[in-house]
Amino acid sequence: IFLVINSNKQGIFYTDYKIAHIQALFTAQPNVKVASFQKLTVEFCKEIGATQIVRGLRDAKDFEYERSIGHMNHAISGIDTVFFLTAQAHSAINSSIIREMYQNGADITPFVTKPELLV
């Protein structure tokens, strides 16, 4: 699992905190590694020897955006992108909505795995 550092978005948690949270979710799966980077995704893939990128799609808007990036990534690196559809129950969830709920004290338990680790 790797986190992309998006300079256009203002997160409420530092990258190291996000990595620690994800690692805590996968303690029973020691083969799962977590990292972050501030470069092109395909450059990171080359560094770690990855040959595919896996992305989740919530809706048609995600597809259009990810398809363009996937085509460009393949053109510059030969690395393919594989898409999975998000479960319908989760398709309306996005980080901006969850962030606003969290900052306003709303219960995010139905939407976030182990939210108690966020404290």
Segments (PLM) and residue ranges:
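Nucleotidyltransferase catalytic core that binds NTPs
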Residues: I1-V119
